[in-house]
Amino acid sequence: MTDADIQILEKKLWKTADDLRQGAGLKASQYAQPIFGLIFLRFADNKYRRFEPQIKAEYEKRKGKLTERPLKEIAIRTCGFSLPDCARYDYILSQPASSLAKVIHDAMEAVESDNEDLRGVLPKNVYSQIGQSKDENLLKKLVQNFKDIPDDVEIDVFGKIYEYFLGEFSLKEGQGGGEFFTPTSVVQYMVKVLKPTGGRILDPACGSGGMFVQAARYMHAKGGIDLSVCGVEKDGETVKLARMNLALNNVNGTIYNANTFYEDPAKSFGNYDYVMANPPFNVDGVNYASVQNEPRFNSYGIPRNKSKQKKGTDETVPNANYLWINLFATSLKPKGRAALVMPCGAESAGDSELEIRRRLVEAGIIKQLTVLPGNMFNTVVLPAMLWFFDRAKPDTPKRDEVLFVDARKIYTQVDTTHRKFTEEQQRCLALITRLYEGDGEEYARLKADLAAASAAARSAMEARLADERRLAEQAAATLLGKANAKKLAKAKERHEKTIAEIKKAAEAEIARLEGHLAWIKENFPEGKYRDVTGLCRVAKIKGEGGIEENGWSLNPGRYVGVVQEIDTTTPEEFRAKMQAMYAEFATLSAEAHEIEKRIAENISRIASGASGSRSSSNSSGSSLSSNSGGSRTSSSSRKGPAR
């Protein structure tokens, strides 16, 4: 399947599932776990079917010999898991709606029994609530919905569908959804900057495991396979989501159910090649005594309250943001790298946090900060900040400097309240880091890829236009032979409209791609890093305009600067613009007077109605309802554009 085909399938599956949810009167929070469980069962059945002939052949070959092994053992070694007959998707689908919840429960229990790695992972106890919804056939319809995933689809498509549903449920759940899901395009940009090549990856607040999945996909695309992941997540239900996510995406690793502030099952200190995370922001109430002697938290200092604690109460850390920052820095091996999401404000926090930040900067391990556009996250409207650490940096000439990137103006609007990075935008932003590192190969590669994509889009447009013109000629010949001028005119109009739509869509795509190409050439014309006002700047720690002089603030806005907009409007253009605005104002004023007149007439009717008889009052009330309604509608329709 092409990426476009996958997107169509994802949207179709989601729309059907969400329509069923709404029809049954269920909340998204009641619906998510059952959905993810069904996606997993469909994936397991699809993957097992591909290995089944090989599994059965080996079982029969060994049967009755000294090397005989249970079918389950052969399946786990060959396919990665064993799938009992009662968990086959077609069997589940064949069962009556009245018993389907129990059938799914038993299927998942059997899968967990056969596969130690999946024990306690599958949401087997949540299907009874679906069975009790307004629509008694809802569960049956859901099982059928995921049967629509083609049997011959590539295995990795299931991981993409799972990820798509995670994102959609995150949107539905609002604030709660942000606790388990980081928008994919943000994670992909983080991975592109981090550029993992193998080793151990830690996420101490892993949510549903999205960081691991994107890192694994990146490494797979680059030919890397040596990847081991370790995640820590305090919410037990989210741990299940993460473990299923890893299974669906063929990622090896361990997810611990623990609170990172008080437990360290990952044995994090100095043990990881990469750390990636989007931890909870601005957590308060962490017990100070529990973290004060932990090297993973205290190596650069622990935030303290300025005021003394009340007697009889335990001291708490005022804000845990810098506990997380400490943890990311101390979890890295000597050449390890980290990428983390922090709220805007953490980079300039004062008091004890400023002192911690100074130590981190002077240690030379902070490599880059990128401020993101607003509305990139489902739960955070304001821009967030990405911090990048590099433990190898202190041994390089770049030790005493930090790269700042302002990405607030680079985004694609998804809807009125959400934004994302396209693949091209991610690569353009990551190119800044590559050029800063002295890697010119990505510059040439990205330019070539954009030029090729633009040429391909143009060729595809020309091919579609040729097909449409051929269809138009065939239709014209048929209708001309029948001497049907009216139908011929309509057919011609329809084809002209289709051709215009094809051109518009293709030209927009070509313009988008060529716009990225122009951006690269304009900002980095020689294929080398340079400071660009409003976009990026390398700031020294010491010296004029340096980080120390700026109070150890790491806010990119202090260093990158702002592009000064030059008004190139001519006097003639200004006069024409003012005349147009005056004409619009005059029109709106006339309409406002008309509305005032109608309001006065309505008030007059009310007054005359009130002085009449009760029966005539009722009559005028009926008339008033119509008139005042019209007046309100008219007034409302005029207010919108005026604002």
Predicted stretch roles:
Residues M1-L194, T254-E263, S268, V371-G374, ...:
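Non-catalytic, mostly N-terminal accessory regions of nucleic-acid modification and defense proteins
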Residues Y31, I35-G37, M190, Q309-F389:
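Conserved Class I SAM-dependent methyltransferase catalytic core
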Residues Y31, Y272, N319-A320, K335-V341, ...:
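Active-site lining segments that contact anionic ligands and/or coordinate catalytic metals
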Residues L41, G236-E237, Y262, P280-V283, ...:
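Conserved nucleotide-binding/hydrolysis micro-motifs of P-loop NTPases
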Residues G176-A277, F281-E294, Y322, M342-G345, ...:
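Conserved S-adenosyl-L-methionine
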Residues V213, K240, A277-P279, Y322-N326, ...:
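Feature representing long, continuous alpha-helical segments
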Residues D284, Y288, Q292-P318:
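Conserved catalytic motifs of ABC-family nucleotide-binding domains
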Residues I365-I366, M376-G438:
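C-terminal, active-site-flanking charged/polar segments
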